[in-house]
Amino acid sequence: MKRIAVVGTVHEEKGLANAAGLLAILERIKPELIFLEIPSAALDDCLTGSRSDLESAAVSRYRAEHVVDLVPVDLPTPEADFFTNNRDLFERIERTSPDYCRPVDWHSQYVRAHGFAYLNSEHCGDLFSQLRQATDSAIESLADQRLAELYDLWIRTNTLRDQAMMRNIENHCCQTSFSSAAFLVGAAHRQSIITLSRSEPGAASSTVLWEFSGFLEEPH
């Protein structure tokens, strides 16, 4: 049985959500391979230490002491205008919706205060659900066709990414022998990954045991 621990992360260090905390989780999981939320084109930068995100820093420190394979599973990075448009979209929502700002602020506070224990909790998933509802309501209230289209594109893009990452992991499981792996993914994707792991079974499903929180505590 292949065990895959799905670890919800953030890409920038904030309080207890830091590289040292993620490294401690990796030391508990002891993965033989790590699935990464990056496209194949970014793997070289990760291997050479050129990437500056939290996950890359923790993985680099783990690789210094352990033999581990790194497997990129994300789709190619969208064009720059995708990110520019999304920044404009959410800045517009933030200026007009207190119901959106509250869960954003709460999330930031919880990440800083509780780190990975929060990022891999039902509480975090519930807060992202509140955030999605507040965003939906704000888009409806703004009644701006362009913003609605940008929001739909953002949702579709992330849905396709989640599906592709799970498909790529499953394909790798069919082709490779291992006992323990970690999947480092932004916490905003975590609930979708949980849902996909429980949906229509694929060829590797019977040989994969998904783990979503057991790695948070030291083994007894």
Named regions from a protein language model:
Residues 1-220:
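Compositional signal for N-terminal targeting/processing segments
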